[in-house]
């Protein structure tokens, strides 16, 4: 693989992020929603995208389950595969950001180190980690896919929160506690954060 890379040359793009900013009217960025299964990551991400779209923003959602149907269909749930899953998503998100898009990435992304590696791909203001905080007991009570039940019975191995760890972010840009707040209030928190930092228009 190393020898093959010697024959690969990076081709610089003609259009810049500044060009996209002038046209789109907003900064490109990644909203990285992380948390336990059942915490409400995807629900919140989709609701935020609806509001951003309504405001005229250019957006795209990268969702954990959807990605595993295609791009990452070759990966399982071992620690190594989970790390590779997040690495690939980070690279895909970077391509979208380079094209001026607001990316909403909803992934358990259980390992702190992996999230920080993704963060390192972006300029400081381009990566916003949103910790979707929800107690394990509440996530289990929701269990929309029946995964906790399978994990507790031993049918499903290496399930985050049961027999595989979730490493809580040390200093996320934003925390949304979905155990005690509505989706609407969560959306308002996210939008207020990006608006107050001048990343999207204030209207």
Curated annotation (Swiss-Prot):
Catalytic residues identified in the record: 109
Keyword Nucleotide-binding in record: yes
Record family assignment: Belongs to the APS kinase family.
Reaction equation(s) it catalyzes: adenosine 5'-phosphosulfate + ATP = 3'-phosphoadenylyl sulfate + ADP + H(+)
The protein's role, per its UniProt record: Catalyzes the synthesis of activated sulfate.
Binding positions for ATP per the UniProt entry: 35-42
MF (Gene Ontology): adenylylsulfate kinase activity; ATP binding
Taxon lineage: Bacteria, Pseudomonadati, Thermodesulfobacteriota, Desulfuromonadia, Geobacterales
Keyword terms of this UniProt record: ATP-binding, Kinase, Nucleotide-binding, Phosphoprotein, Transferase
Pathway stated in the Swiss-Prot or TrEMBL entry: Sulfur metabolism; hydrogen sulfide biosynthesis; sulfite from sulfate: step 2/3
Identification of the protein by name: Adenylyl-sulfate kinase
Top enzyme class: transferase
CDD domains: APSK
Entry EC number(s): 2.7.1.25
Membrane-spanning parts: none
GO BP terms in the entry: hydrogen sulfide biosynthetic process; sulfate assimilation
Cystine pairs: none
NCBIfam families attached to this UniProt entry: apsK, PRK03846.1
């Amino acid at each position: 693989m190393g020898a093959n890379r010697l024959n690969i040359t990076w081709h610089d793009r003609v259009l810049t992020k500044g060009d996209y900013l002038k046209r789109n009217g907003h900064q490109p960025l990644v909203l990285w929603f992380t948390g336990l299964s059942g915490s409400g990551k995807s629900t919140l991400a989709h609701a935020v995208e609806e509001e951003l779209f309504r405001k005229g923003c250019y957006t795209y959602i990268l969702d954990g389950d959807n990605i595993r149907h295609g791009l990452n269909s070759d990966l399982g749930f071992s620690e190594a595969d989970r790390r590779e899953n997040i690495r690939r998503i980070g690279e895909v998100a970077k391509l979208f950001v380079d094209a001026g898009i607001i990316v909403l990435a909803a992934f358990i992304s259980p390992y702190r180190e992996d999230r920080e590696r993704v963060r390192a791909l972006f300029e400081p203001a381009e990566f916003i980690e949103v910790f979707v905080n929800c107690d394990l007991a509440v996530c289990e009570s929701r269990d929309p896919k029946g995964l906790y039940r399978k994990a507790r019975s031993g049918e499903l191995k290496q399930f985050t929160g049961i027999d595989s760890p979730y490493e809580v972010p040390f200093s996320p840009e934003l925390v949304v506690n979905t155990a005690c707040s509505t989706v609407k209030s969560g959306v308002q928190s996210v939008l207020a954060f990006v608006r107050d930092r001048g990343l999207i228009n204030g209207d």
